Curated annotation (Swiss-Prot):
Other information: Present with 2650 molecules/cell in log phase SD medium.
Keyword Membrane applies: yes
Principal localisation: Golgi
Protein name in the entry: Protein CASP
PANTHER family, sorted: CCAAT DISPLACEMENT PROTEIN-RELATED, HOMEOBOX PROTEIN CUT
Lineage, broadest ranks: Eukaryota, Fungi, Dikarya, Ascomycota, Saccharomycotina
InterPro entries reported for this sequence: CASP_C
A single GO molecular function term of this UniProt record: SNARE binding
Functional description taken from the UniProt entry: May be involved in intra-Golgi transport.
Cytoplasmic side: 1-614
Native source species: Saccharomyces cerevisiae (strain ATCC 204508 / S288c)
Regions that span the bilayer: 615-635
GO cellular component: Golgi membrane
Lumenal compartment segments: 636-679
Length: 679
């Protein structure tokens, strides 16, 4: 729905001012009900009077017919006032609520918008929470990629370790196989050597066996030769083993150098891999920090953009307000241009106030007479205003009487409440004394014995004498009894005390409300008294215009009321101001000459009322017409006479004409001077 509809409805309901309208309607409804009751009572009394009038004799009916007619007229006036008041209330309400739109769709749409606003607030809070959470977990993708990289690198390292381990195992097995093969070759060589030696020894042994038969002489030499040959064979074996071991050592040294070179190369590659892994870890950490910083930067950018948008909206609203203020200023300037004659109207109003409150009756009569010459409808407007003021005065009188009755009723109710409060205070004091009696009883007995003794004594005492009313209500024993039932009596006493306190608080609240209503009624009565004095001043002001025209038909009640208000009005006037005005008028009149005083008295007589003013006006018009006709007649006659006579007669006629005009001008000048002096 468009905002213009809301603004239009807001303006209309603001102009209607529903709270004040409800307050006024409450007061108006109360007044209508009062008038209804008064009209019912008056109609009942009128019905009884008519019944009595019907039962009278014809002669008595003629005597009392004016009275019954006046009562009917009064009842008709009351009914017309009641209908006018009801119509006024109805028209006021209609004027305020005629253009007011139906608030149901507006309230429904506003409720829907409020629900949407609440949902949007919750969603905004959720979005902000998720954005904060997302900013905290901005390195999720980097962590995920790092995890994948770590998994891949761990798989690669595991594969590398497996390959290295397999290579190591293969190399160890190859080395062992090679060693075993070399050992086997060495052993085979040794075996072949041993076999050759064995064969050589067997050949030698066979030779020796063949030669044994040749003689035992050569036995020692042969033994020596055998020993030498065995030693030579052993030496050859040792040398062969030494050669093989040296070759094996040389091969092992060469293999050791190759393995040390491979080990150095492998250690350098591992260091490079560790450095690379550390650099990758640092790089991943920097990437995660970068992601967090970029997320925080993005969040800050969004918050700053949101703040910028809010500031732009505030700036636009301020610009719109400034534009509205400028338009209002332009309208005010136009109004000021339209009200450029304010000072003039203010001067006229001050003059009217002076006429109303601070000028003599003669001066005000002169001003009003001059205004009557310019505007003949002024008197009719004053008469209508007088009627309206009289109607409002009657309404205020009825209101004041009703409020006096209400004030008397409130006084009576306040007195009754005071009496009730006094009785309640006495009852409360009595209850407190009874409570003190209950609390002061000495608890020397146990519960069972005290209860039994209390019950027996209470029964005995009831046979002998009566209990007090308070004791009979709350169950307090007399002075001679013990408080055995204290544990059961105290809750009852406390409950009754609470009831008395709540009742006392309610009565105090009612008393405060009565005092506040009494103060409000006193303020309203003082306001009504001020309004009545102002209305009396206006009536005095309006009666100064038609004192000589309007007939005096006032009842004794109205005379008494007006005498009361006249006394208040006379007391409110400042005596020094009246004395100063009278002295000023006396001083002005004293400075005048006898001829001016004669002219002023003549002007006062002429301008005294409407009849004298009209007579003087017709007299002036007739005199001027007569002079004009005589001059025309003399001019026409002069043409038929001789030249000398015509000249003489024309001179005489002109002198007569000048004399008549001079007299009229003197009278007008005298009236003007008197009017200026009075001003």
């Amino acid at each position: 729905m468009d905002t213009s509809v809301y603004s239009h409805a807001l303006d209309i309901w603001a102009k209607a001012d529903l709270t004040n309208l409800q307050r006024e309607l409450d007061a108006d409804v109360i007044e209508i009900k009062d008038k209804e009751t008064l009209s019912l009572n008056s109609r009942k009394s009128l019905a009884t009077e008519t019944k009595k009038f019907k039962k009278l004799e014809p002669e008595e009916k003629l005597n009392n017919v004016n009275k019954i007619i006046k009562q009917y007229q009064r009842e008709i006036d009351n009914l017309t006032q009641r209908s006018k008041f009801s119509e006024k209330v109805l028209f006021d309400v209609y004027e305020k609520l005629s253009e007011a739109p139906d608030p149901q769709p507006l309230l429904q749409s506003s409720l829907e918008k409020l629900g949407k606003i609440d949902d949007s607030k919750e969603l905004k809070e959720k979005i902000s929470y998720l954005e904060d959470k997302l900013a905290k977990y901005a390195d999720y993708e980097t962590l995920k990629s790092r995890l994948l990289d770590l998994e891949q690198s761990s798989a690669k390292t595991l594969a590398k370790r497996l390959t290295a381990k397999t290579q190591e195992i293969n190399s160890t097995w190859e080395e062992k196989g090679r060693n075993w093969k070399e050992r086997e070759a060495d052993l085979l060589k040794q075996l072949t050597n041993v076999q050759e030696q064995n064969k050589a020894l067997e050949a030698k042994i066979s030779k020796n066996i063949d030669i044994e038969g040749n003689g035992n002489e050569d036995g020692d030499q042969e033994n020596n030769q055998k020993e030498v040959s065995t030693r030579i064979a052993e030496y050859n074996l040792v040398t062969q083993e030494l050669e093989t071991t040296q070759a094996r050592i040389y091969q092992l040294e060469k293999r050791n150098e190759e393995l040390s070179g491979a080990l150095a190369k492998a250690t350098s590659e591992a260091e490079k891999e560790t450095e690379l892994h550390a650099k990758e870890l640092k790089l991943n950490q920097l990437e995660s920090e970068n992601a967090l910083l970029s997320a925080s930067y993005e969040q800050e950018r969004k918050s700053t953009s949101h703040a910028i948008n809010e500031l732009k909206e505030q700036l636009n609203s301020v610009v719109a307000e400034s534009e509205s203020y400028k338009s209002e200023l332009e309208t005010v300037r136009r109004k000021l241009n339209n009200y450029s004659d304010y000072n003039k109207i203010k001067e006229e109003l001050s003059a009217l106030k002076k006429i109303e409150f601070g000028v003599n009756e003669d001066d005000s009569d002169n001003d009003i007479r001059s205004e009557d010459k310019n505007d003949n409808t002024f008197e009719s407007s004053l008469l209508s205003a007088n009627k309206k003021l009289q109607a409002t005065l009657a309404e205020y009188r009825s209101k004041s009487t009703a409020q006096e009755e209400e004030r008397n009723e409130l006084k009576k109710s306040v007195d009754q409440l005071k009496q009730q409060i006094a009785t309640l205070k006495e009852a409360n004091e009595k209850l407190e004394t009874d409570l003190e009696k209950v609390e002061n009883v000495s608890p020397h007995f146990n519960e069972t014995a005290s209860m039994m003794s209390g019950v027996t004594r209470q029964m005995n005492n009831r046979t002998s004498h009566k209990m007090s009313p308070t004791s009979s209500i709350i169950g307090i024993p007399e002075d001679g009894e013990l408080s055995g039932n204290q544990s059961t009596i105290l809750p009852i006493v406390t409950k009754q005390r609470d009831r008395f306190r709540s009742r006392n608080m309610d009565l105090e609240k009612q008393l405060r409300q009565g005092n506040s209503e009494k103060g409000k009624l006193k303020l309203e009565i003082s306001k009504l008294k001020g309004d009545n004095t102002k209305l009396y001043e206006r009536i005095r002001y309006l009666q100064s215009y038609n004192n000589n025209n309007a007939p005096v038909n006032q009842s004794t009640e109205r005379i008494d009321v007006e005498s009361q208000y006249s006394r208040v009005y006379d007391e409110s006037l400042h005596p020094m101001a009246n004395f100063r005005q009278n002295e000023l008028n006396h001083y002005k009149n004293k400075k005048l000459s006898a001829l001016e005083k004669l002219f002023s008295s003549f002007a006062k007589v002429i301008l005294q009322n409407k009849m004298t003013r009209m007579v003087f006006l017709f007299y002036c018009i007739g005199l001027h017409g007569l002079v004009f006709m005589m001059s025309m007649y003399v001019i026409n006659i002069s043409g038929y006479m001789t030249p000398e006579v015509g000249i003489v007669q024309s001179a005489k006629s002109s002198s007569n004409l000048n004399g008549g005009l001079g007299g009229a001008e003197k009278v007008a000048a005298g009236v003007g001077s008197v009017h200026g002096i009075n001003r």
